[in-house]
């Protein structure tokens, strides 16, 4: 898994203080991003269409994860929207792409990681395949694939970042019924991933823990 990552991204991840996974949740606001006080040692991970890409900054490391749509033979969110393309143009050495669920051989491009379906980590290999009704699940969500990979990296030498999830707390939006969300949420809450509540959900319980008394914005 680690070998799949571009060498430049591995260097930045070893230096990172935080890796923050951002869900495609419409309830995420500019205030939620401002409250994180993001800086150059933060890695921000977005998924597929990256609906909150307008809030991203070229100051951070940005990773864009795209899942493969097997029935329509394309990656969700590609080609990127103009606001994402601008980030790659402004900060090409700090923007990376992860392609998940690749089913046919592909040649890696600079700053692009390729993961085949399915990523050989126990949490993903054990992912439910069938519903009680007998209807199959589509497999792990793009965000869950990335979350498990970044959590796994924390067990490898040299990676010491804190892992956060923003917008994975179900404040708004809908969940596509093709994924085993109960399995994904149960794993997340039992893992070392720290779920950040959105401003709309009330007081941020994690704020004093992360910023050790610094005044919230």
Question: What is each of the regions a protein language model found here?
Answer:
Residues 1-217:
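Metal-ion/cofactor- or nucleotide/acyl-coenzyme-handling active-site neighborhoods
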């Amino acid at each position: 898994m680690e070998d799949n990552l571009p060498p430049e991204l591995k260097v930045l991840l070893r230096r990172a203080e935080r890796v923050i996974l951002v869900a495609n949740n419409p309830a995420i606001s500019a205030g939620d991003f401002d409250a994180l006080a993001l800086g150059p040692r933060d890695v921000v991970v977005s998924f597929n269409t990256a609906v909150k890409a307008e809030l991203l900054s070229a100051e951070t490391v940005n990773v864009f994860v795209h899942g493969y749509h097997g029935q329509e033979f394309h990656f969700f969110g590609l080609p990127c929207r103009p606001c994402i393309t601008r980030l790659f143009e402004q900060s090409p050495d700090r923007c990376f792409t992860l392609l998940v669920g690749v089913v046919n051989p592909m040649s890696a491009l600079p700053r692009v990681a390729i993961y085949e379906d399915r990523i050989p980590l126990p949490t993903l290999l054990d992912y439910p395949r069938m519903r009680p009704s007998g209807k199959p699940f589509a497999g792990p969500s793009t965000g869950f694939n990335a979350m498990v990979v970044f959590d796994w990296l924390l067990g490898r030498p040299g990676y010491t970042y804190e892992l956060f999830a923003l917008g994975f707390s179900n404040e708004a939006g809908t969940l596509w019924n093709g994924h085993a969300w109960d399995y994904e949420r149960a794993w997340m809450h039992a893992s070392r991933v720290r779920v950040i509540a959105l401003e709309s959900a009330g007081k941020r319980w994690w704020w004093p823990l992360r910023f050790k008394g610094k005044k919230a914005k």
